[in-house]
Amino acid sequence: MQFLQNIPPYLFFTGKGGVGKTSISCATAIRLAEQGKRVLLVSTDPASNVGQVFSQTIGITIQAIASVPGLSALEIDPQAAAQQYRARIVDPIKGVLPDDVVSSINEQLSGACTTEIAAFDEFTGLLTDASLLTRFDHIIFDTAPTGHTIRLLQLPGAWSSFIDSNPEGASCLGPMAGLEKQREQYAYAVEALSDPKRTRLVLVARLQKSTLQEVARTHLELAAIGLKNQYLVINGVLPKTEAANDTLAAAIWEREQEALANLPADLAGLPTDTLFLQPVNMVGVSALSRLLSTQPVASPSSDEYLQQRPDIPSLSALVDDIARNEHGLIMLMGKGGVGKTTMAAAIAVRLADMGFDVHLTTSDPAAHLSMTLNGSLNNLQVSRIDPHEETERYRQHVLETKGKELDEAGKRLLEEDLRSPCTEEIAVFQAFSRVIREAGKRFVVMDTAPTGHTLLLLDATGAYHREIAKKMGEKGHFTTPMMLLQDPERTKVLLVTLPETTPVLEAANLQADLERAGIHPWGWIINNSLSIADTRSPLLRMRAQQELPQIESVKRQHASRVALVPVLASEPTGIDKLKQLAG
């Protein structure tokens, strides 16, 4: 494995949720400890539960791992860190500023950027503690800061003075006010990250087109700010032996090999390792030790793993329920790569096929959806908005209005603030909201939705409500986009996830965030499930068994309505395949 050769003191793993960062970081830590190195493993992944992996309690203080001599671990809870961080900023102003101002500030500090910055605050303590490198040869982190966070930390000028003069404009600069450590410490931490003698960054991906494109963007973004010592690990690759006697396994293998042969050009030059798909979840030292093997695990015979099929309705049953209202807004929500665009297209095609008037609006960057579907069904209209164009338009508007009075340092801060994920969400939602009102007469299906945090920022603790109420007078009837989304009679939010631990946890967090904004998801779609796919591959059957607890947890803990969609042998593009998916 190339990424394991001549490892510097700090090793960071980065990649989207569910690609295997924590498993690979744990396996790496074990491998190094077995070589006689003293290793500290730092986990900030809320889904990881490193303690469960090693069968012992791990907390916010360094604990020796009993089962692996030489290995210690530490868990940083990013949500708890963010909560303490918020309290540091908000508690001193409670009772001093009006309640609505405090509430607005609290909301600015409730997004992903705050969690990210609070976690980096904790990282900084570890990266700048010289005594740790006398106790440990390697410190391994199972997540890495984003380029956006590092750029914010690199920017000159006082964050707090910028925030004081722009209280209503800062979505990601608000959190900077709570940074406790000295600027020199952050500068040292960023310098340590950029030094190839001290830090190696491992990008973790699966062989899926969207995941690889996302990793390529991360690679470029981090390289541009000096983090150039990067390696690529492709995890969960199906062994060729599984493809021999099974149609589905053969199709998956071919799809993955094609993705491997056509890696994004930006990734082609990186030292790359591949890890095989494992039959069981990575819990316990023996399972983790096998993960870094260059040989696939021998599978049992397929008869040993007869499939237990979960009793959960198909997507068509969910669409039949949706159709009863005869019109309405259908919004699909979920993390990147879970299949929102495909699910939205399948729902729209099925509704149109049932005779309803449907407008499918997509932010699919590939634009293949609009090309495949447009004009194919008489009562299906397809429109596409370009997230990059909309974001750029929104950024220019903010820079021309709020940026007008700022000095150069202030403008640079505002420009970086406008690179936050919240900005794209707001811009895309504003573009989508142009068609939302059509949902009173027909079905409007959207393949993306803003988070609860973004909606609350947009709604600014009801300021939008009050402004419209003032204009309409007491007797006027009015509806803001927020009110429309909060009305279950008119809007159905569907969460899309995968039957794996991290994607389910991420979807549950999205649901909790929407509920803070008074929006209750109507149902969940669990996509890409092996548990209801037809396969004789022993490895895929074993993986199907691993899905069952996750599917059960969605059904019991998170959703009143669930649909299960199988892994498909070929990509569902075109009317006929989409009809099959939701038919």
Swiss-Prot record:
MF annotations from Gene Ontology: ATP binding; ATP hydrolysis activity; ATPase-coupled arsenite transmembrane transporter activity
Catalytic activity: arsenite(in) + ATP + H2O = arsenite(out) + ADP + phosphate + H(+)
Protein keywords: Arsenical resistance, ATP-binding, Nucleotide-binding, Plasmid, Translocase
SMART domains: AAA
Enzyme nomenclature, EC number: 7.3.2.7
InterPro entries the record matches: AAA+_ATPase, Anion-transp_ATPase-like_dom, Ars_ATPase, ATPase_ArsA/GET3, P-loop_NTPase
Pfam families attached to this UniProt entry: ArsA_ATPase
Annotated positions binding ATP: 15-22, 334-341
CDD domains, A to Z: ArsA
Domain of life: Bacteria
Family affiliation: Belongs to the arsA ATPase family.
Cited PANTHER family: ARSENICAL PUMP-DRIVING ATPASE ARSENITE-TRANSLOCATING ATPASE, ATPASE GET3
Purpose: Anion-transporting ATPase. Catalyzes the extrusion of the oxyanions arsenite, antimonite and arsenate. Maintenance of a low intracellular concentration of oxyanion produces resistance to the toxic agents.
Protein name as catalogued: Arsenical pump-driving ATPase
Organism annotation: Escherichia coli
Lineage: Bacteria, Pseudomonadati, Pseudomonadota, Gammaproteobacteria, Enterobacterales
Name of encoding gene: arsA
